[in-house]
Amino acid sequence: MFSLHFIDEAFNEVYAGNGGHGIVAFRREKYVPFGGPAGGNGGNGGSVIFVGEQGETTLLKLKYQKHLKASHGFNGKNKSQNGANAPHLYVKVPLGTVFFTMDNHFLGEILHHQETLVIAKGGKGGRGNKALANFKNPAPSYAEKGDLGEHFKIKIQLKVLADVGLLGFPSVGKSSLISLISKAQPKIDSYPFTTLFPHLGVVLIDGFSFVIADLPGLIPNAHLGQGLGIQFLKHIERCRVLVHLISMQSLDPYKDYVALNKELQQYNSTLVEKKQIIVANKMDLPDAEKKLKDLQKKLSDVTIIPLSLINFYNIEKLKYAIKNLLQKTPFVIPKHDNFKVYDLNSETQTFTINKNKEGVFVVSGRQVEIFSHRTDFNNEAAVKRFNYLLKKIGIEEALKQKGAKLGDQVKICNYLFDFVI
């Protein structure tokens, strides 16, 4: 059951930890005149990882905890001691939580208990001079700085995970129905918008169980934000089956049916393709039979289940109808474009070179940024290695092809260099 503080959207800033720096050190022992390099590697920075938790029902904590920061990795030490990796920051979220960048680029979602999703990856620790030693340079006098951890803003949405969604305009009897067929105890009254947030209930029938959600009532133009609007329309996307309640107290039940489906269509056209069970509620009222017959004539190709919650009429029939339809309707995980996949060993070699208005050649690219962040520019040997790495991946030749000449300025990240052939 959700609390009065049900929050289904939050905006947060994630900070993964930076990698620790490798260090320059040499073995200093008596009777060992040429001990060689002994600088340890830096530890990896902590990542920001979200974890699905079945007991969580709201994003309330994230609503007020705007900044999610993981720790930095520890620096390496002498005597070949590596710095410790930083612990990851684990954040518990409800099942059905979806993550986006601020420009709505899909990052991932969590659907299962204890499922994890790395949103911001911690920086890799820099190598010490012992790890950088090779046959060409057996005693390097430089080390690598740790990589920066990822840092950006995200939008988090909770889309309720329920098998069945109860739909209808305000006061059609959704809350009363879910309280009768499950153990949910929503607030029930006769005024519109009694339900201000989704209520979940579990229905058991012949050893089969399903989760049903009482969603806040819709009104015309809900897809434009009228009433509770889009705030809760998104929860319908997860449901496999929709139970559409129509009140026989309405002046025109058919008009209500058409209007609600129009709202679904205008919000997301795929919603009207979901399996629906049409329920004519409040059959105990005068003229209900006449209105039901008129509705059946206009919806001749649709089975309508008449229902009276006061008289408990057809409640069991509805439960079995939902069960049978669910057994024929498999759960389909929504597809998202641009899914973010982490390759922990990926350091793409692509780069771009552009000449700005000031005549400066600007070099950008993921691997170039990594080289830059790992280099200690106060260390002459480290700068020489930086130049060697740029030449190795073809940047020097690419600059020549772009027309760079001796003495021209080249900008890499926040550093300006003079081009030397």
Curated annotation (Swiss-Prot):
Residues 162-327 form the OBG-type G domain. The lineage of its organism: Bacteria, Bacillati, Mycoplasmatota, Mollicutes, Acholeplasmatales. InterPro entries: G_OBG, GTP-bd, GTP-bd_Obg/CgtA, GTP-bd_prot_GTP1/OBG_C_sf, GTP1-OBG_CS, GTP1_OBG_dom, GTP1_OBG_dom_sf, OBG_GTPase. Monomer. Keywords: Cytoplasm, GTP-binding, Hydrolase, Magnesium, Metal-binding, Nucleotide-binding. It is found in: Cytoplasm. This is GTPase Obg. An essential GTPase which binds GTP, GDP and possibly (p)ppGpp with moderate affinity, with high nucleotide exchange rates and a fairly low GTP hydrolysis rate. Plays a role in control of the cell cycle, stress response, ribosome biogenesis and in those bacteria that undergo differentiation, in morphogenesis control. Belongs to the TRAFAC class OBG-HflX-like GTPase superfamily. OBG GTPase family. GTP binds at residues 168-175, 193-197, 214-217, 281-284, 308-310. It comes from the Bacteria. The keyword GTP-binding applies. Residues 4-161 form the Obg domain. It comes from Phytoplasma australiense. Its cofactor is Mg(2+). One of its GO terms (molecular function) is GTP binding. The gene is obg.
